[in-house]
Amino acid sequence: MSKIWILLLLVGAVQFARGFPALEEEQEDDVIDWPSFEYDLSDEERGKGLDWLKKQWGKLKNSFKKVGAKVTATFNKGRDYLKKKGIKVDPLNCQGNKCRSCVIFTLKPKKFCIEYVFSTSAITVSLIKEKDDEEKVLLGPFTIKTGNIPKCCKLGSFIGELCLQGVEGRLKSSNGKPHVNLCVGLLLKKFGCGAKICVSYVDGKFSVSFKPKLFAGDEENGTIMEAGEKEDEGKVIDAVPE
């Protein structure tokens, strides 16, 4: 693909993003209100649609960069915890634009769940603790807007501080079809571990929820950072599905 075509693709994505109305702070409607779109697959994309999307999204991934000693130490702590399989995240269970996923600590059995309501450029979140088949709302519901700095809150001495950040990615194909990914970055600062939970919005409706991605991570300069393969490298969390 030529550089000119890539530039045109990105310009189209920006123009598409500007066409979406902003979500008002006081809006409490849980019903998605995004426009409907024409969605006609070409013969090429019928056979290779998923591969094509993965390739295009891959070009929009954030790049890894060097991080400082403090962040590197947190990354290493997270890597060690993940190697022990001390934490896992359930796949999203969705009904319409309302989804739920649970974070499970395996070394010291504890579990809390997060409920998401995905809406235009924002995600409404509730935190729920599960114990002995009983649920207790810890926080929320509250709204995180995509593109904003993380919202952080303390959840007790064991879990510590939890940070949530909304990110989105928008893409147009050569036929003008919009593909939008909405993701929530979840960071457990005490453990140096995070998760990225994403859904895809295509043809005027939610179509795909992706398997949550666990990563070693930290917060730096007002954003959640995801550790790379190299010890001292990380990247700003993005909305590219894995």
UniProtKB/Swiss-Prot annotation:
Localisation: Secreted
Per UniProt, the keywords (alphabetical) are:
Disulfide bond, Secreted, Signal, Toxin
Q: What is this protein called?
A: Venom redulysin 2
Tissue-level expression reads: Expressed by the venom gland (posterior main gland) (at protein level).
> Which parts of this protein are propeptide?
20-46
Q: Does the keyword NAD apply?
A: no
Instruction: Please give an example of a GO cellular component term from this record.
Output: extracellular region
Q: Name one GO molecular function term.
A: toxin activity
The leader peptide range reads 1-19
Q: What does this protein do?
A: Highly abundant protein that may be responsible for the observed disruption of sensory neuron membranes, since it is homologous to proteins such as trialysin, which forms pores in lipid bilayers. Probable insecticidal toxin.
PTM comment for this protein?
A: Contains 5 disulfide bonds.
**According to the lineage, what is the superkingdom?**
Eukaryota
Family recorded in the similarity comment: Belongs to the redulysin-like family.
